[in-house]
């Protein structure tokens, strides 16, 4: 059996002044609200065990505050867990030195943000090439690669524009090109299309599917939109208050909801239409 590329084991995250002191209550099953009321600490994640296969688009869903962004930010250690282990390609991410962690972030993964995260004082070309400049790639080489990625996302000819001159959809294309320009193994996408109008959003989904068919990256994708999750995901994980409610293929989520919380997500979906939108077999 193939080893998963990403593995979370018994992952817990508690926010507050003394998170470890709260762990006995967490293990006893106290709710998020109870822990906050009793200790002033906030439960972010509770006992997450999750595997993500290489080459998948893995979608993470949940209501706001359910822990999706917290979970994803553990992968590159923008957030460290209170307890638990994180493995990427067999490497224990928690054991990386600061130098190793910086190299890991530079070369193994990239992020695409909801609010684009572009540098306003740099041109489109400079924004796309930014990650390569951090890697100290020669200017001519990084600009050549940046131009290639701009062509790939349909922005050939926009190299000398500035982010403020672009539409929201165009800015997110720049963000996607920038993330891919460093050739990362893993792409972390935190609600990347949620601020776009529906038509532009659909076009960005099409572009992502088209690029993924060619590149076969491992993509961890956060969304609140079930239609988007069904269209993009090989697997979907649904979180509630930092706990995994269900993990499964899109059709499993639609047909066999694990609990009332998951059922609430799929209740208003036309199931026949939802099944027909599933892109990934």
Locations of regions flagged by a protein language model:
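ABC ATPase "signature
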Residues: 247-248, 256
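A short, proline-enriched helix->beta-strand linker immediately N-terminal to the Walker B motif
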Residues: 181-185
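Conserved ABC ATPase "signature" C-loop
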Residues: 241-242
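Conserved ABC ATPase signature
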Residues: 162-166, 170
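Helix-to-loop junction immediately C-terminal to a conserved catalytic motif
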Residues: 76
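Conserved ABC ATPase "signature" region
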Residues: 7, 24-34, 91-92, 129, ...
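Conserved ABC transporter NBD signature motif
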Residues: 84-92
